[in-house]
């Protein structure tokens, strides 16, 4: 892709303000970490942000001008801390996370609406005690107590054991669930399940064997509802077009739906070390973005129109794939790069990477502690910084002895997350 079409600057020697978003993004991340450790609350950080903005404005107009950038970086760090403080302390009194322990682990009526596509799981043919189940995340709007219904906020991850009717995004549901706080296993250094759910805004888990009442479909975004309806249609078409094993694999690798995978299939992928093939990640999204851009250019669309159309379709695909965290991250990163082409700006990959990180962390600062988020950005950073160095090292090597470009990218990607 020619440079005027937003080709990334291959050199990483840019200095000064050529990449202004990189120090701002790093400061934002540092602020998130500091607030998580110190727990000062949003008011203190906003006070410092105000001081930094006033100081930067004064330095800009009357000097010393050298203080403008440091004050802006400090201000962005405090904005990151304030965003994290809001995520930690910004819950209202009626939030699910504040529900007293006395109401947990006992049947409690609730109402809410489904905020994402459901995750149905078939019964385990090897274990009669493992019934079919449907799991979905609900934005709880009311809890039922002896005194009556009480308005509530917060999300819960609910599981209905046994057969349940069709559940879709935006559906309002009512049922009696046993709620509990997410539990962490005691394995040292093991997976922190409560923290993982917290990054997704989920405060409680719940389950029931009782029927769940559907109250209608009147919540949520009409656009998302249409995308998820299209996703459900595609899943049904795949089921009807081919046998179960093949359909299950296609649904998992293309649309992110693993509900059709049997326990035997899951175990086979785990035993072979290839389970990651089933996960939709940045590779899928970047290949799609590149293919779409190339297709539109072949159709003689201008670079800006091709990039804009590719952005729309990549965003649509993220929804069709279930809008999981990894897919959304990859879509945001691809769209950020394509946006530079739309704006007719020379795309610098480090700046694009920093901008996407700022957007994601502003929306949900808890993502910074998510291992998937960290690995995604470290691997991408490894590619951005590693490929130019690989090219320079291999410049003097005869062509027949060089490694393929795909292996260069693989080595660079793996070097990013490697411990030093």
Task: Name what the model sees in each region.
Residues 2-15, 70-276:
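Membrane-interface helix/helix-cap signal primarily in integral membrane proteins
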Residues 16-60, 370-373, 377:
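Membrane-embedded alpha-helical segments of integral membrane proteins
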Residues 21-23, 27, 46, 71-79, ...:
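Small-residue packing motifs within transmembrane alpha-helices
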Residues 23, 31, 65, 206, ...:
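Hydrophobic alpha-helical transmembrane segments in multi-pass membrane proteins
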Residues 28, 34, 57-60, 80, ...:
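Hydrophobic membrane-targeting signal helices
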Residues 41-47, 61-74, 302-304:
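Membrane-interfacial entry segments at the cytosolic side of transmembrane helices
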């Amino acid at each position: 892709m020619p440079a005027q079409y937003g080709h990334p600057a291959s050199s990483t020697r840019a200095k000064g303000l050529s990449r202004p978003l990189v120090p701002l993004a790093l400061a934002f991340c540092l602020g998130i970490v500091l607030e998580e450790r110190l727990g000062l609350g949003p008011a203190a950080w906003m006070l410092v942000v105000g001081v930094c903005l006033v100081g930067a404005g004064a330095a800009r107009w009357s000097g010393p001008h050298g203080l403008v950038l440091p004050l802006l970086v400090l201000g962005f760090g405090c904005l990151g801390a304030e965003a994290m403080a809001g995520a930690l302390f910004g819950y209202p009194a009626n939030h699910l996370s504040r529900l007293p322990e006395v109401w947990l682990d006992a049947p409690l009526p609730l109402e809410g609406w489904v905020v994402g596509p459901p995750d149905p799981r078939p019964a385990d043919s090897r274990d009669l005690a493992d019934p079919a189940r449907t799991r979905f995340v609900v934005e709880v709007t009311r809890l039922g107590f002896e005194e009556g219904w009480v308005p509530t906020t917060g999300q819960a991850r609910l599981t209905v054991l046994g057969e349940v009717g069709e559940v879709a995004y935006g559906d309002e549901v009512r049922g009696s669930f046993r709620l509990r706080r997410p539990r962490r296993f005691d394995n040292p250094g093991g997976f922190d399940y409560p923290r993982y759910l917290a990054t997704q805004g989920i405060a409680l888990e719940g389950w029931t064997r009782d029927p769940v009442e559907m109250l209608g479909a009147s919540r949520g975004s009409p656009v998302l509802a249409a995308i998820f309806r299209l996703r459900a249609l595609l899943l049904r078409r795949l089921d009807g077009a081919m046998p179960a094993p093949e359909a299950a694999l296609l649904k998992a690798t293309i649309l992110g739906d693993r509900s059709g995978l049997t326990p035997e299939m899951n175990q086979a992928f785990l035993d072979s070390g290839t389970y990651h093939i089933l996960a939709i990640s940045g590779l899928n999204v970047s290949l799609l973005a590149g293919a779409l851009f190339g297709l539109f250019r072949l159709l003689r669309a201008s670079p800006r129109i091709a990039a804009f159309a590719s952005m729309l379709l990549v965003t649509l695909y993220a929804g069709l794939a279930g809008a999981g965290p990894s897919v959304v991250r990859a879509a945001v990163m691809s769209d950020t790069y394509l946006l530079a082409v739309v704006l007719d700006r020379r795309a610098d990959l480090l700046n694009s990477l920093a901008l996407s990180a700022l957007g994601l962390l502003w929306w949900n600062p808890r993502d910074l502690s998510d291992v998937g988020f960290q690995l995604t950005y470290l691997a991408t950073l490894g590619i951005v910084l590693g490929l130019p160095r690989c090219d320079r090292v291999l410049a003097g090597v005869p062509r027949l002895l060089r490694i393929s470009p795909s292996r260069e990218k693989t080595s660079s990607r793996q070097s990013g997350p490697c411990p030093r």
